[in-house]
Amino acid sequence: MDATDRGILHHLQEDGRLTNAALAERVHLSPSPTLRRLKRLERDGTIRGYRAILDRRRVGLGLTVFVEVKLTAHSQRRAEEFSAAVAEIDAVVACHIVAGMADMLLEVVVPDLPAYEQLLLETLLELPGVTDVRSNVAIRTVKEAGPLSLGQPT
């Protein structure tokens, strides 16, 4: 990946709706080589997709909870079973295997506390291998996932 590729990625992270012509202008290439580079970055998985960023509160998902999960066993099989089950839960927007006091860290987005309580009792505590759960309710989000820092754009 060279500086031009990083420039393409930088500008698309800022505005995923840029036309190829506008993107080409920003990275100082003509449209054809810009499009070839873009298609390569998509093909090789560097660009995994494009999506709209929604305001969680405006769509009725005003509560974010970070859930620390401990599993019964520290095995690849157990982590895979848990991960497969979590992937099916729409309210879980992120799941990380972590080092520390917990084995997994989930980011859960739900309408409100009663909805989280229901999810916790009926779903999360029933997942394979779960022995302990600690919930951390976000009071306010200061910074959400944003563009990855790739250095100075071209």
Residue ranges and their predicted role:
Residues 1-154:
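A compositional/biophysical signature of low hydrophobicity enriched in polar/charged and small residues
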